[in-house]
Amino acid sequence: MYCGRYETIGETRGNSLNVFIGAAAGFVAAVALINSGLATSFYSTPVRAVPQVIVPSSLAASSQLPVVPKETNIQVNSAQILYPDSTVKGQERTITILGVCSFLSASLFYIWKQFGMKARTTKPADLQEVSGGRIWSLASTTGSNIGAGKTVRVATRKSPLAMWQAEFIQSELERLWPGITVELQPMSTRGDKILDSPLAKVGGKGLFVKELETALLENRSDIAVHSTKDVPMELPEGLVLGVICKRHDPCDAIVFPKGSNLKSLEDLPHGARVGTSSLRRQCQLLLKRPDLKFLELRGNVNTRLAKLDSGDYDAIILAAAGLKRLGFSDRVLPGETNIIDPNVMCPAAGQGALSIELRTNDPEIAALLEPLHHIPDAVTVACERAMNRRLNGGCQVPISGFAQLKDGQLRMEARVGSVTGKGPLIIQSKTFRLPWSGRTWPQLQKESEALGVEVADMLLADGAQAYLDEAYASRTLGWA
């Protein structure tokens, strides 16, 4: 898997299946065409009659044979008059009909599946359709519109990125359930208001979701839309992170001021000022570039970019998904040279994925959201969050985790670093086969979480606890 080119398993086999279905449909149609007699009528040909004639039994019995005048051109069917090589020509035509119909049907069906269906669900900023993993989806729609007349209240932060995400979910629900009403409820969270202190000192990432969760618990909202990496590992009783949407780019990007000639991390000059408040990003970059100077960076994406362009920093680190969703395509350089490889900077748990939080006792809302749950990405996110939860990871600790699912293999890699940047990264990974056939989402979730916990225990066995203790004893530093 490569950041910026995020792949979903099953797409290749799905394309092949589309072609096969189309070809089969064309073959069946061609057989029906031939059997109906239309094919032979289409290929009836003026021929010169020859004396060799099929004689009906009734005429043969009476010896009243029909006479065909010499040199007479008549319109005949190959099933009526037997002329030389008529059988061969009929076979050739039959094969031609079968081949042409199968090819055309397969081509048209493939084009419709690949482009016609996707054209109806294209979303802004290149975000792939949420329900793109149709073969894995939990959706069990039967044609009934359970959304008709239903109102869904969506709690969201007020930042441009948060609003984009909420509007995206709104459009998906309206597409899935005609007649549904989706109301957005923008809210200011404490995390949005406190911009002069590191979050580790004032409560961590939970400050971005607490007000939204309160609205859910008080039944003022039905769902809350989040950037999954900002959601705490432990949720309040009565709430569940029930939906993980199709994941976008999970990687980080190094962004340069407008007009800069820099193209990648390697191009940064010695001692460059890099804006990021993330301990996760800092400790990994320090191992590659110990000369860099990190400066505090807070605010929404637009604010951070404005600070960069004003000269406060030589570069800043942002999530690639946020840039792409907001349409800052000019900040992603040609060839995506400024997208940082996950081998250099392992992403945060859940980075790049939208998630939806809801009440555990609300089956009607859960049914409406079910088609948005993208199981392959839900599996990887569940694995990452389980690892982080096992380590009691919060914003004070430089923990990163990235799971990848490909060809039935689930691979999890996690890293823990020192908040001082002086010690080496502790890195552990493991891969195991995750069978899909006949498995339910709860079964897949349980096994993926078990892998996350196992990798976390491997980190602890390798000495990660010392780094964790160091981080929690040094909360005056930044946040991860």
Curated annotation (Swiss-Prot):
Necessary cofactors: dipyrromethane
GO biological process, one term: chlorophyll biosynthetic process
Cofactor note: Binds 1 dipyrromethane group covalently.
Positions bearing S-(dipyrrolylmethanemethyl)cysteine: 395
Location(s) in or outside the cell: Plastid, Chloroplast
PROSITE patterns associated with the record: PORPHOBILINOGEN_DEAM
Entry protein name: Porphobilinogen deaminase, chloroplastic
Native source organism of the sequence: Euglena gracilis
